[in-house]
From Swiss-Prot:
SUPFAM superfamilies: ADC-like, Formate dehydrogenase/DMSO reductase, domains 1-3. Its EC number is 1.9.6.1. Predicted to be exported by the Tat system. The position of the signal peptide cleavage has not been experimentally proven. SMART domains: Molybdop_Fe4S4. [4Fe-4S] cluster binds at C43, C46, C50, C78. One of its GO terms (cellular component) is nitrate reductase complex. This is Periplasmic nitrate reductase. CDD domains: MopB_CT_Nitrate-R-NapA-like. One of its GO terms (molecular function) is molybdopterin cofactor binding. The gene is napA. It comes from Campylobacter fetus subsp. fetus (strain 82-40). Residues 36-92 form the 4Fe-4S Mo/W bis-MGD-type domain.
Amino acid sequence: MDRREFIKSSAAAAACSAAGIAVPSSLSAAENQDGWRWDKSACRFCGTGCGIMVATKNGKIVAVKGDPLAPVNRGLNCIKGYFNAKIMYGEDRITKPLLRVNANGEFDKKGKFQEVSWKRAFDEMEKQFRKTYAELGPTGIGVFGSGQYTIQEGYAISKLIKGGFRSHNIDPNARHCMASAVVGFMQTFGIDEPAGCYDDIELTDTIVTWGANMAEMHPILWSRVSDRKLQNSDKVKVVNLSTYSTRTSNIADIEIIFTPHTDLAIWNYIAREIVYNHPEAIDEEFVKANCVFTTGPVDIGYGMRANIKHPKYLPSELDTAAKEKSTVLSENEGVTLAYLGMKAGDTLENKSTGAPDKHWIIQYEDFKKALAPYTLDFVAKLAKGDPNEDLEEFKKKLKALADLYIEKNRKVVSFWTMGMNQHTRGVWVNEQSYMVHFLLGKQAKPGSGAFSLTGQPSACGTAREVGTFSHRLPADMVVANPKHREITEKIWKIPAGTINPKPGAPYMKIMRDLEDGKVKFVWVHVNNPWQNSANANHWIKAAREMDNFIVVSDPYPGISAKVGDLILPTAMIYEKWGAYGNAERRTQHWRQQVLPVGDAMSDTWQYMEFAKRFKLKDFWGEVKVDGKLTLPNVLDKAVAMGYNPENTLFEVLFANKSAMKFSSDDKIMAGYDNTEVFGDSRNVVGSDGNVFKGYGFFVQKYLWEEYREFGLGHGHDLADFDTYHKVRGLRWPVVDGKETLWRFNTKYDVYAKKDNPNGDFSFYGNKNGALVTGDLAKATSKEKEALKSRAKIFFRPYMDPPEMPSKDYPLWLCTGRVLEHWHSGTMTMRVPELYRAVPEALCFMNEIDGNKFGIKQNDIIWVESRRGKVKARVDFRGRNKPAEGLIYVPWFDENVFINKVCLDATDPLSKQTDFKKCAVKIYKA
């Protein structure tokens, strides 16, 4: 071990020690590495996108370490990263399909799980799928997808569901984490994903975190922030805005604890400070050339059920549910909505729930007028989150925050994650971040920009770029656009008219439709929907007590697997080939390192095997979707294209002529397993009852090269498959082999330069866009004004959330993650070292509240809302330090099933759930 490796190992050991975790053996000392094969890969966990080096010997993973050549993490890992390999070897890893059966071996929803063959599993799955499709059509099936799909997995399942089955009822768990960011991007820029990159950290003077505990959720990025702060601590400033105190505050110059939901008001305060008190700070040249001012309706509801008296609601839920129809304006809303002629006590009827994304161009003077109420005095009283903090001190913090943004030559990066996205006005608050940066001309520049951080490893690369959302197609295209469907049908080589023009159900609607009997077949991939969805009691009851069939592809028996009817054992990250796309648009590929455990097979294999079970004639004839829409018969067109109605979906969508051009004799695979291509030495008996010998063509390369056709020449360009196996990722668009660091800036982005050769910026996502004009209340014209590659500066008001603390439920509840565990803990709770470090989810709370409710440190309490209750252990002294009036409970622990308590309200535009705020009471268990 050389000095460099020794230093890195020492740093890793220190990190483990600080977390109370045993050091991985591969880092504890220099080891004999004879016969080890090291290869680059990617970390399985968050959206940072760290590079990993994986060592194998004799078909086993013997070590993992940070990749010193990876520009993201530069050889470092967080504590989860060092245990990437161990997630694959939990004692209860599922190795064979499991089906609920009765004593006679027949499927029985009330039966017990029993090991079955792949053939038996697929036979039952096919039977149940056909039954549901015949009864309910394309809307009767549902797929819970993931921001943890590999890119090829997401592309394959989208092609099967959208192109083969003609359904769009597929939605990823990224709906829970990034949907508000996506809609914010699309509404503002006309194109998805951040303008900047991680290089901004080393170039900026100011890092402001909004609802982003980067120290735990993006720890490697936070190490880069810390390094930047230490380089010049006097000039570089860090501000942390949060609803409770976190580790991210440890290096912050300013910590601002605000009341949940009032980030909306704080952004407007900053904008008001710019517009009214520092108009000289407005970059008028930038704004005039590159922006238009816009607004939209406020009567949009809260993304709950339209039927406010739905029979499945508990009586205790009805008062919150009623706010979907109308709300009585509070004193604060009377101030913030005065520009619409409204006042406190007025009833706001939510008439725009059907078109919450509608918006129009307004004049700058309208924009300025709407900001008028957001004075320092008003916002400070509204937003101060710690009742025991002095109001004048809080005002000083808000003023200092605004001053940092406004300072003439100061570079500023605003980072956010779930605090802004998991929000019933998440799209609005995303748009507000761009509002401030645009006004100051501090966007799409090195070291300056509003930067949405992704939570999952491929929420960007798969869920967003591939388009596994219920309304999307690859490369930012949408299913409702006829031209986009036409492009997709041509690339997929399927008949015109095959793709359903009606978007499918988003994540929470699939759950609600399951409860209502409108969805009866669900397939779960790479996530844990029955643990990760708010108001979980409803959905568990629906899964177990109704006439439906739930398939869960999973390596472990998490909550979703336990409520399912069929569990399919799934290969994990280093047991398959794959690719992820991270938060800075960096795409990274890896090779299969080892064989899957037991009879587990990859998700891609499962999709392709399922596709073998169905023929074109089963779905490409006339298909009734609902009372208003019938899909056309496209079989004649298919025959004209050279297909036969007897062809399987596998033959047409996957094992087609184009796919066969990708040879199994490819040097990229030399010396590596590829189970999908060759089969493997396990001789797994596949879905047809025969030993699976491989597909005989380079599946992953074919899927990649077909997928990249969508983005070429359209600002989403990706490199070819082979290139990614030679580099440590590339940030798209990749044009002529060169990655793009700052989009929309003509110095760095060839698309911006092409669109505006004589200017500095082009927000070309809006090149062909147009909007009607109006005033603050409504659109007043019918004629549209061309956007001409200009971005939008939105005005969005503060409004209360649908549920706030009251006499009966006096506390705010916030949920989230912890450093040591990933999401629902299905993988990390099975790593002994991580489990020992944090074996249970605690209820972090302020001791003042403890004294108020007669609760002491380590007491077991009930946390109860209108929807349900759970037990948790109290911690007054832990890493998370809420102010009086708020508790924080992470959701990784299935024994502290906090999503039984949470409210399933969503942002009406993005359909993303707000996990960050609901009202609860606590008492001793």
